[in-house]
């Protein structure tokens, strides 16, 4: 179920609860269709929420593109942190979400704008364990199987 589908489902009272990334919880609350009970950071500190992922194929066939993607991600994240109002306007414009809702969501959100994958490694490994225990994946993954930090390390060493 996508975020949009989940918002529709809770708005139509087809489900009793949803777990979604921001700004969806704020949208639901502002529309009077639910309330935020717990922030995801309260459930697991330093959890991985929205992450940059590239395929092994792209890494093998076009590492120079991956390098540029990582550099762009770092610059964009830093820009967002320094220009939150402008970032909110860009997001609202691209998604057609109400600007005030986006700004409120950014204030309520308990996450952090980060680029260093080391900060979410433990959370990602733990998430993998849960996915395995639920039978969604055939085995629990290690940090080394999930992360290739070489592109991040190279990008940050060139600053």
List the model feature ranges, each with a label.
Residues 4-93:
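Pocket-lining segment of extracytoplasmic ligand-binding domains
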Residues 28, 45-47, 109-110, 148-151:
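Short secondary-structure boundary/hinge segments and terminal tails
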Residues 38-39, 102, 141-142:
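Residue-level detector of family-conserved "landmark" positions at structurally sensitive sites
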Residues 60-138:
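Secondary-structure end/capping motifs
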Residues 129-159:
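Conserved C-terminal helix/tail region of periplasmic/extracytoplasmic solute-binding proteins
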